[in-house]
Amino acid sequence: TRNEGRVRALEKMRLERAGRQEQTGNVRLSIQEAERSGRLVVEADNVHFAFGDNRIVEGFSTAILRGDKVGIIGPNGSGKTTLLRVLLGELAPQQGSIRLGTGVRVAYFDQLRAQLDEDGTLKDNLADGNDMIVVGGASRHVMGYLQDFLFPPDRILSPVSSLSGGERNRLLLAKLFLLPSNVLVLDEPTNDLDTETLELLEERLLEYGGTILMVSHDRAFLNNVATSTIVFEGRGRLQEYVGGYDAWFRQRTAPVEPPKAAPAEPKQRRDRPPKEKRKLS
């Protein structure tokens, strides 16, 4: 059956990933990673969760492994953020069980949005006014690190209040990537990102050796980053698929309200085939 075929495809994908030799990237382009988690990151067994009569999750089981980059797809209000909280043990399922693997260290992008000091400089916000920060276990000058996020050297002492929306989001990413983690949780991370910052985010995530759980309506983002998707298919039914948004759309067996498009200008440009990855300096 098609369901059995999907399960076999997911198992094949995970076996191939487990057998791959781990890649080591340029430290300057790496997210700050904690010690590796165990191979199993999250296991859900026949999980049920509801708010009153509103069924969010009905009998869902999955195993998320180290290195998985899982996209979560569903209509607005379907419970995607709730699912994240259940998977991470922040909300207890009403039936079934959740098991977190050993050594899991989680960093949340959405929780950083209000953590910028408007009166402080970029240097203050990243390094508490110090010249040096630790990235990938090595000391780096904060100016060089900020240049990786497309800030020119003369902006290092600028106050956060002077930043544009795109610059502010790049600073948030710089803060996120300094947090030691082996699991990244991204709830609508592409909202309000300009194209340049979005491409920067994708490059960083592709290089990240840990596990990623991401809620997004951005089809191109999911296609470029996700190795699998969990899809809300109505009435609490969730299904897991190999690949990103387009792969799900080809494999789906139940009609689902399609995700809304990202803002028009970046989306139109990014619907073209992905360009070759560029290096930042």
Give the role of each language-model region:
Residues 1-4, 150:
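Short intracellular "coupling" helices and adjacent cytoplasmic loop segments at the cytosolic face
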Residues 3-9, 13-21:
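Intracellular alpha-helical coupling/juxtamembrane segments of multi-pass membrane proteins
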